[in-house]
């Protein structure tokens, strides 16, 4: 097998391990899951698994990082210079991902395991809320260079916009079995956008 072929196979095996481990961790939680539980589902040897992940903690952290990245990655927005379309697009992408089944399950699991595995909550924070604020602040700064409306203090404004987007809806989904409709998510984004524009935006013209 060529080196490229071996690399592709290794990457595929890593993704298979991650996908299976995610199902097991979500079903049993971190503390009640063992490497043997994962291997029982996916097959193979411990040696192969440890070649990709040196232990259960590393495997769990990789899962958390994957879903945290999904929640904090914003879709590329059209740079039209118009602020409301930008906010609506970014807000819709963020809230849809944040409220998705897998991301919510990841947050629940991380919080439940925090007393025993505090490194996980740090990974969640740095790859989730913190990274989202940093990326959004960067987009706000870019908008200020080209847009007709200016966002006051992009770093603080990013925190405020994301907090308004999450609002009560995120905690309702996180702590109950509630599942918002697409219409409800769209409305939440619209309301958050209007509140944000009123409190954090000034006209340059």
What does each of the following model-derived ranges do?
Residues 1-44, 52, 57-58:
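Basic, helix-initiating cap at the start of DNA-binding domains
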Residues 13, 56, 63, 67, ...:
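Hydrophobic/aromatic residues within well-ordered alpha-helical segments
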Residues 17, 55-60, 70, 120, ...:
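Short amphipathic alpha-helical segment with a characteristic S/N-K-E followed by hydrophobic residues
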Residues 27, 61-91, 96-98, 102, ...:
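Amphipathic alpha-helical linker/stalk segments
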Residues 47:
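Key DNA-contact positions within bacterial/archaeal DNA-binding proteins
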Residues 85, 104-105, 109, 119-145, ...:
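Amphipathic alpha-helical packing segments from all-alpha helical-bundle domains
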Residues 88-121, 162-169, 198, 202-204:
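Helical hydrophobic small-molecule/effector-binding pocket
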Residues 122, 144-194, 204-205:
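Hydrophobic/aromatic-rich alpha-helical bundle segments in the mid-to-C-terminal region
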């Amino acid at each position: 097998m060529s080196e490229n072929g071996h690399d592709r196979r290794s990457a595929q095996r890593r993704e298979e391990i991650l996908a299976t481990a995610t199902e097991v961790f979500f079903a049993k939680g971190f503390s009640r899951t063992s490497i043997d539980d994962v291997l029982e589902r996916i097959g193979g040897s411990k040696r192969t698994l440890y070649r990709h992940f040196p232990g259960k903690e590393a495997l769990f952290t990789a899962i958390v990082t994957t879903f945290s990245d999904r929640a904090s990655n914003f879709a590329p927005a059209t740079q039209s210079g118009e602020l409301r379309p930008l906010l609506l697009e970014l807000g819709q992408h963020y809230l849809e991902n944040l409220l998705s089944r897998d991301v919510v399950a990841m947050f629940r699991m991380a919080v439940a395991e925090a007393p025993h595995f505090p490194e996980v909550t740090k990974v969640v924070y740095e790859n989730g809320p913190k990274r989202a604020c940093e990326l959004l602040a960067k987009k706000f700064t870019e908008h200020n260079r080209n847009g007709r409306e200016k966002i006051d203090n992009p770093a603080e404004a990013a925190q405020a916009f994301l907090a308004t987007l999450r609002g009560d809806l995120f905690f309702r989904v996180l702590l109950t079995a509630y599942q918002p409709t697409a219409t409800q998510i769209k409305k939440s984004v619209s309301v958050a956008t209007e509140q944000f524009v009123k409190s954090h935006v000034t006209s340059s013209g």
